[in-house]
Amino acid sequence: MLYKKTETLSIIRREGEIMGMFVNPNAAAFQCAVNSEVYIDKTGLLEYTNKVLGTNARFICNSRPRRFGKSVTVDMLTAYYSKGCDTEKMFSGLEISRCPDFYEHLNKYDVIHFDVQWCCISAGSSENLISYITNIVVPELRETYPEVNLEENSTIYGAMARINTALGKQFIVIIDEWDVLIRDEAHNQAAQEMYIDFLRNMFKGIEASKYIALAYLTGILPIKKLKTQSALNNFTQFTMLNAGPLTPYIGFNEDEVIDLCDKYEIDFAEVRRWYDGYRLGDYHVYNPNALVNLTIMRTFQSYWSQTGTYLSILPLINMDFDGLRTSIIEMLSGSSVEVNVNEFQNDMVSFADKDDVLTLLIHLGYLAYDQRTQRAYITNEEIRQEFRAATKRNKWNELIEFQQESEKLLEATWEMDAETVAEQIEKIHAEYTSVIQYNNENSLSSVLSIAYLSAIKYYFKPIRELPTGRGFADFVFIPKPLYRDYYPALLVELKWNKDAETALNQIKE
């Protein structure tokens, strides 16, 4: 739901409460979000977190790609729960204010909130990270609870346990960018183990079950696995593979995008071609960064480079795993590929095969995952451009040779040279018989997608099974706006054991 602000909101400090940097922080960050030109109301998430407060489901890790609203979400949670501010006015009119338990939890909890990425920079090194966080949080807890003797407690979890024992107080711990060390210090095993131990001490064990009312971690990666189990196996993980009940609160969904398009008079069909593609359950999910930039710049283009450049995927797609490059080529052409996402260790170094690489690309947002078919695919035109830039920069010989063959096919198609078209498709079909079945229609569909790979420069991703009145068109290639005056739309009809005349008659009908 689009939220339209009616006045400038202000931060109100709760009387008698101490606002700290990490302990009971104020709501300034979320106020900025609510006051922004484009703000989508996602406070319905608070209804879920209120429901799991104080239950076994209170440990949450919600991972998603860059610029998918992670920080806005943790700022919202902090603003709602923190004792350090009075945000009744800020949340009035938003979705959560209509829930029966809105006031029961509003500004009622001691909240500890920190951003690990920011802390890493401030600490100066990964080795100093834990001591940096501890040296801020523990003194702030002492200031918040001077009546509790915390002088002998030098750890965050020790201080929380002591306060809980003395006063029965529980805490909400919110960690943004929890996985920075896992990503940026991928080969620093000692730093990672120290950090995982820090999180375990805070969130696992009998004492933690007493003092934690809610734990919410967010980052790009799910919690790292040790062997086959999560290092924090008491956390429920909501990811780009399966976000469960949190799906409506990840990115912008289609109804929200339609509202934005209506408000800013933007062509929704064009938005879908450029930025749709992530599927979580029954939801079409869009990258908020792209949509917000589109409303400002009014130009359909890739805004992904402002989030993470194609250089970040080069080392991944160049790994020497059987079938990896073939899978990338297939997905570039518009096809999807089967992927086993269950063995990935949730880090940046433990790759056993191409499935692990593809799973990481899903978590990074470069690929989408269809849980029903267990297949991965390139989401939309924006991401396809990033892959094209990556493969062009690296000069893939296989891709260059394949594109040359594909360009011959495309030119022959434009020139209506049926003989050359048949020869090129037969040649490409023969090359892929080792990985797909030769004779059925699905196999031929895959071959055609790959064969027309060069079309991605001039056409959007081919639309399969497009409704056309009587029946469906097997493939439709729609030219991009820049090329609509130069190249025709391509309509492909597949027939088994029938001639071209039959297909043409069906198209005409």
PLM region spans:
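Structural signature of nuclease core domains in nucleic-acid processing machines
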Residues: A418-E509
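Phosphate-binding site recognition
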Residues: L2-N440, A455-Y459, I463
